[in-house]
Design a protein with these regions (language model features):
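Phosphate/nucleotide-binding catalytic core
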Residues: 1-191
Length: 191
């Protein structure tokens, strides 16, 4: 198949008026009735899965307009429930209080993932990030992963072009990530 398609996933954070995580993901799932909307690891995260578009001159405009439409719908639900929709890499206001099992989305998939990764490690998850400050911790579950969200682009290409395009994507990943990272704070540490 020579048709090139592009799609995306937009992860987002739900926050309350004081910018702390809002654990009301279920309200959005129920009220939106949107097949492109799905849960994420934590009760304060959601994900919009955009449909794939044929990669032609207007593919990015279609992606943007579809995403804006979905975000607008979610923000209307948020307005009715004192919740803001936030697109950010790392939520700078997150605290350890939100990284416990009560904040995990109740889904057997996430519980199984946590159990599997814990059993493979046979220890806590070690986190060590050096920046202006240093964050060094051992966390007992996978919820530390819920601190960050992303915008992921998916590109479907012809099989014979995969190696070249994959290598190209690896070359640009670091500078794109460096320029797109938007929160230097995690657990009160300057990273």
């Amino acid at each position: 198949n020579d048709i090139i398609r592009i799609g995306a996933e937009q992860e987002l954070v739900l926050v309350s008026k004081d910018w702390s995580p809002a654990l009301n993901y279920d309200v959005f799932i129920k009220e939106a009735q949107e097949p492109l909307l799905t849960t994420e690891l934590a009760r304060f995260n959601l994900e919009i899965n955009l449909p794939p578009f044929e990669f032609k001159t207007n593919a990015f405009q279609k992606m943007e307009s579809t995403l804006r439409e979905k975000l607008s719908c979610l923000q209307a639900i948020g307005d009715d429930n004192q919740t803001k929709i936030l697109l950010t890499g790392i939520l700078p206001t997150i605290s350890w209080d939100y990284l416990n099992f009560e904040c995990m989305t109740p889904n057997p998939r996430y519980e199984a993932l946590n159990e599997l990764l814990r059993s493979k490690r046979n220890s806590n998850f070690q986190i060590h990030i050096k920046g202006l400050d240093e964050l060094l911790t051992a966390h007992p579950n996978i919820l530390f992963e819920a601190c960050n969200t992303s915008f992921q682009v998916h590109l479907q290409i012809p099989q014979d072009k995969f190696v070249e395009r994959y290598n190209w994507s690896q070359l640009i990943a670091a500078p794109v990530l460096a320029s797109a990272g938007n929160s230097p704070l995690l657990m009160g540490k300057r990273l």
